């Protein structure tokens, strides 16, 4: 039974982690994912959610204040 618990934990962690280069769509636009509360300056650098995680958005790099 312990083996099943270990196997489940391993599979859970394997699927929970993301590949090394996550958020490809945001990075292709020259952006970076920031928490949604951050303000992108100028507003035109706010690309929206794109492929960022939940409650995060994509802003052009260096614009998150």
Curated annotation (Swiss-Prot):
Keywords assigned: Antimicrobial, Disulfide bond, Ion channel impairing toxin, Myotoxin, Neurotoxin, Potassium channel impairing toxin, Secreted, Signal, Toxin, Voltage-gated potassium channel impairing toxin
Disulphide bridges: 26-58, 33-52, 40-59
Gene Ontology MF term list: potassium channel regulator activity; toxin activity
Gene Ontology CC terms, in alphabetical order: extracellular region
The keyword Signal belongs to this UniProt entry's keyword annotation: yes
Cell location: Secreted
Residues in the signal sequence: 1-22
Taxonomic superkingdom: Eukaryota
Primary location group: secreted
PROSITE patterns attached to this UniProt entry: MYOTOXINS_1, MYOTOXINS_2
Gene3D superfamilies, A to Z: Anthopleurin-A (2.20.20.10)
Tissue/organ expression: Expressed by the venom gland.
Cross-referenced InterPro entries: Myo_ane_neurotoxin_sf, Myotoxin
Record flagged with keyword Secreted: yes
Protein's GO biological process: envenomation resulting in occlusion of the pore of voltage-gated potassium channel in another organism
Assembly description: Monomer.
Job description of the protein: Cationic peptide that possesses multiple functions. It acts as a cell-penetrating peptide (CPP), and as a potent voltage-gated potassium channel (Kv) inhibitor. It exhibits antimicrobial activities, hind limb paralysis, and severe muscle necrosis by a non-enzymatic mechanism.
Recorded family membership: Belongs to the crotamine-myotoxin family.
Protein name in the entry: Crotamine CRO1
Protein source organism: Crotalus durissus terrificus
Protein's gene: CRO1
